[in-house]
Amino acid sequence: MQPKPELYSSHYAQWFKDPDVIAAYPSRPPYAEAAIQFLSELATDRPRRALDIGCGTGDIARRLAPLIDLVDAVDFSAGMIETGRHLPGGTASNVRWRIGAVEDVPLDPPYALVTAGESLHWMNWEVVLPRLADALSPHGSLAIVGRDWEGPPGVRTHIRPVLMRHSAVRVWQDVDLLSELQSRELFTVLGSRRFGPDPWEPTVEQYLECRHSQRSFARSAMGETAARAFDAELRQVLTELCVSGAIQCLSDTLQLSVETTVTWGRPPGGQNTR
């Protein structure tokens, strides 16, 4: 069995149980609306039931639910799920929140669609992928969903050094999740689409809060003094980018954008075959 890259260590996933990270998580930009619609179209088998793994606060699950029959939203962080219940769509009758690790939480297959929004990299692939293969319906798909809100190259060039100086994770690896899964023969890609850019207009403080929802900048991991220094430096860089025109600013909001990528396919094997 190939070891996972250190950057994807389950140790870092534990930070998503941290109350500060949970509180900051809703500040993340939403996945593109067109991507949510496309995910619903991937669920072709009847009944149109989906499983959202590592659902966090349910940005996918809550928005997918009106478009299909049922969504089981699973996360090992009780705090994330409790937050999701209180967000729009969180009390829908066809959203079933389940607290537990995907490796062993009770499931209710078959599922016409499994979604993994920026979550699969934290899991035990050798356990989870075969389990999903068994849980998928005959024409079901696993959709791996990601989003890019880092901005154009000119903006990234200025922000990246700040991120690297202050990151609580001191592991630098260029890792591609899909390549890792395919090299282990755990996932077969059937297609990929990119959606957006969609506008994202946070204030500077909302942008900083969004950064603190990431494992590398969790306040509890950074420490109070380091977190304040990070905020001050990044706030200064954002101000300079607004003044220079590299980032358009309207009133007190940053005129940014977010793109969403959906890559779908299927883990090999499984009890249900096409």
Annotate each PLM feature.
Residues 123-132:
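A short, conserved alpha-helix within the catalytic core of class I
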